[in-house]
């Protein structure tokens, strides 16, 4: 089967199109990681909490922790280092759109920095999630990226960058602690603003602190720790500090050892202490300031070691005054005054506007412990606020701030077994952040659709404003307002204040988001229902240090302590100081106002498990977080309009490869408007119009499946281009290999002769002149090629048969044929078989049709060494009996055209095989039963076959047994070929394109490479001969095994050379006589007339011309594929007929006369003979000048070579057969 090649393209030279400056050339991303799940939750086919969880789980287990919801980043804490925050990874995100790279916190940072520069807008990122979900880590990575991405032109800019980064270890040490859920939990909230100058370089910064958890200083639950700085200081303090401040190990202090957890996994306190000291130096804290900070920390630790006992009156008394003396030394206050402030409380009585009496009320042990702890908490809280203000002072040292990027890292939503005032404050702030998240997200979405004039369907969502009002409202009063009223009513008694607050809570029972339960109340937050304890909640809301403690600190001689406690006691003031609830409401509203002035980005963090394990994924816990974070609503809001949107330029840059209007060979060629380019891309990609809308500046795609289809087509583009390049390269290499093989074969044949012809000659000797020869066996091109079914190739029918019958060895001979099958009481049948010969075994393969699929099975497996003899007749039939030496099987009787070649291969493999040739074939029809098959001459038998009936073979008389193989014909001479081409062009007028359209289309069977049908005498063998190389087809040197079909109408613009003209150049150029002088002009010759030798009913195709035996027609064109273009004598119909069915009409004696401009008469057309030989008529008068003839021939040869070069890709010549 010939290799099909595409026709060559007509290449038109064009100037390369200028690529738009806004569209980048597409490149194949070889480092692209195979995606697990979807990188954007809006692309989920099904939207549900379970589907979101399943997608996050797949990515988490694949070490992919980041996922988008539109522009919102979802981050799952991996609890391990994934190596995704290196400088190399950071560089991959610089200057990239978020769709060009996988989801990452660096992509959010790049987007903020880019938007600030491009749109001159303030940016902020809101990081939310529960404790231990990775909020602080995300904030650190954003600061890391912005510091690295922004340019540095001056030393001061570089210093600001270093200071911004130094705030992380400093504030982590003083504001983070180990909890049961997180080893580095932020116990405060902060909003860091990085300010940039007009060149977008960081030039300043500011930190706002929110609600430090002061209670952690004095008490922690079991297996938790105090703030990191206490353990860093007690473990890593220098000898000078230990001597000056009396620093001991953490086990020696109540505040650090009471919870039973001194160390924590993944935390190195000594190393972190050095990082803290380094950060202090970078920020600009002097050594004296550092000494005072650590002096206060030592004082807090020693305050915690102050303990009390009961005196004789049952009041509190300091157990060890040496401890209070050392605390007084550290705070630089009077020791007795300190003791008095810890065990007594000053009370004043008022009489209207007059000041009343002052009383010193002694405290019991519980009250004294509370006063001690209040002093420690006050010192640490004020120290933390001073550190934040000191950092801000350093960051504001450089003027010129224009725009800013804000990073909000705030505590996550908290639900504990016992929840008090701290939890209601934390959860209130998270409610406010959720509110602004929903408002800004939905508002931004609505504004986008309105701006782009896009139609969309609004989505319902839960607005938690009602919960925020429940907590913060003043009219009607909310929970904080009710708490303030209770404190004002019973300020002197905490228990009374709690009872008053419980009574006021009855006002909220009608609110659907509130529930009252005895001494507890429930608020139904967006993240879940939280139960709060009433006991002690009002006292925490006061947030006031006792006036006597304030007066105590006012007596200090330490200027640093006086600095961090700037407020003095105003005993005359009657105005109620602000409570903790007032402060948190003001801070939250200020935060919302600040965030509303910036363009927000969002990071929603998720904690996958409580075990802090990198391999555990708790579905139940994650599902709870998905619900209270509102991820499903966020996805629905995002997809309420469209799952994907992109500006025209970016969309074209991404997908222009999908449209031939916009691209060629990977280059962007579109010169028009980008909107038109978008339309062409969507149109050429067959995207339905209802799946997208075009806005003013952006394209909006409805469903994620549409985007998947576009991305898939874009990916396949690169695969298709690679396949085309590979195909062209393989074709080039194969042509080189074929050319080299042809040259090598020619050289070997010149030196040693053709091995296939040698094998043929050896086979002729094997028969020893004892058997009549068939005409096809004597052809000069006949050679013993062996594997006619191409079994040894990877993709062929022979290889398929070989695999079916499980043959592992190399096949040296393969052919289709027949085998005689006998049945008891019935006539023998000739069944189709396939014969495969390997170096050791002869296989006879049968075929059966099973469910419309051909199945091949082994009928015989014969060891070559077990073959005793082969038996043949002495006539030209093709029957062979394989006689086995010892076997329980009968001897197979087979029929194949290439019997001589099969016997030759068997003889070479087993020299002991006897070749028995006689008038009959003898073989064992059954084991032990000898059977004889006679052969007789019958001229009525088929010319190319035989008749088998009743153990008798009837066949025509063949060639004599001693007939020799014809000499292989010489190849065409290039000069004669050129002469022939020149003559052909001169003698016949080329058919115009318009005329070619009227030529009948070739029969449908010829389009499938099917040869013309054989004459009726050969049709009884057509089925078996169809897959056998026809020796008759080897008459022409340019033919291959598969007979080519005649050209279609579209390829017949130029007529082919006549067979007679081709015959003129068959190796006789040395004897060509000089042409005679030009004769006078003659009339135009008529077409040759042919007569139908057989009936040709045709296949029903309109391009065929049905004929009856004896019909006479004109033959206007003859093709080498076996078809001729015929026309009725009256010219009423024209069509294709098989050449083998036609013979020259006896009354046709017209010889065409030569044209005026040539001096060589045109030869007569070949007559097609039944024996497949040609009787060529050579003109007698060829007596012109040899020089003129050679000149014309060379000119024609040059013209032919030029034409062949132009059409080389379209019509490559078939490889020449060697046999």
From Swiss-Prot:
Changing residue 377 to M: Bypasses the requirement of SHE4 for proper actin cytoskeleton polarization. Residues 1-12 have a biased composition (Basic residues). One of its GO terms (biological process) is actin cortical patch localization. Residues 771-961 form the TH1 domain. SMART domains: MYSc, SH3. ATP binds at residues 129-136. Changing residue 357 to A: Leads to a depolarized actin cytoskeleton and a strong defect in the capacity to internalize STE2. Phosphorylation of the TEDS site (Ser-357) is required for the polarization of the actin cytoskeleton and for ligand-induced, but not for constitutive internalization of STE2. Phosphorylation probably activates the myosin-I ATPase activity. Ser-357 is phosphorylated by YPK2 in vitro. Changing residue 164 to I: Bypasses the requirement of SHE4 for proper actin cytoskeleton polarization. One of its GO terms (cellular component) is cytoplasm. The modification Phosphoserine is found at residues 357, 777, 992, 1205. Residues 1085-1147 form the SH3 domain. CDD domains: MYSc_Myo1, SH3_Myosin-I_fungi. InterPro entries: Fungal_myosin-I_SH3, Kinesin_motor_dom_sf, Myosin_head_motor_dom-like, Myosin_TH1, MYSc_Myo1, P-loop_NTPase, SH3-like_dom_sf, SH3_domain. Residues 1-20, 951-1106, 1139-1167 are annotated as: Disordered. Present with 2280 molecules/cell in log phase SD medium. Belongs to the TRAFAC class myosin-kinesin ATPase superfamily. Myosin family. Interacts (via myosin motor domain) with SHE4; this interaction is important for proper localization and may regulate the interaction of the motor domain with actin. Interacts (via SH3 domain) with VRP1; this interaction is required for localization to sites of polarized growth and may regulate the interaction of the tail domain with actin. Interacts (via SH3 domain) with PAN1; this interaction is important for late stages of endocytopsis. Interacts (via SH3 domain) with BBC1 and LAS17. Interacts (via C-terminal acidic tail) with ARC19 and ARC40; ARC19 and ARC40 are Arp2/3 complex subunits. One of two redundant type-I myosins implicated in the organization of the actin cytoskeleton. Required for proper actin cytoskeleton polarization and for the internalization step in endocytosis. At the cell cortex, assembles in patch-like structures together with proteins from the actin-polymerizing machinery and promotes actin assembly. Functions redundantly with LAS17 as actin nucleation-promoting factor (NPF) for the Arp2/3 complex. Motor domain phosphorylation by PAK kinases CLA4 and STE20 promotes CDC42-regulated actin assembly. This is Myosin-5. It comes from Saccharomyces cerevisiae (strain ATCC 204508 / S288c).
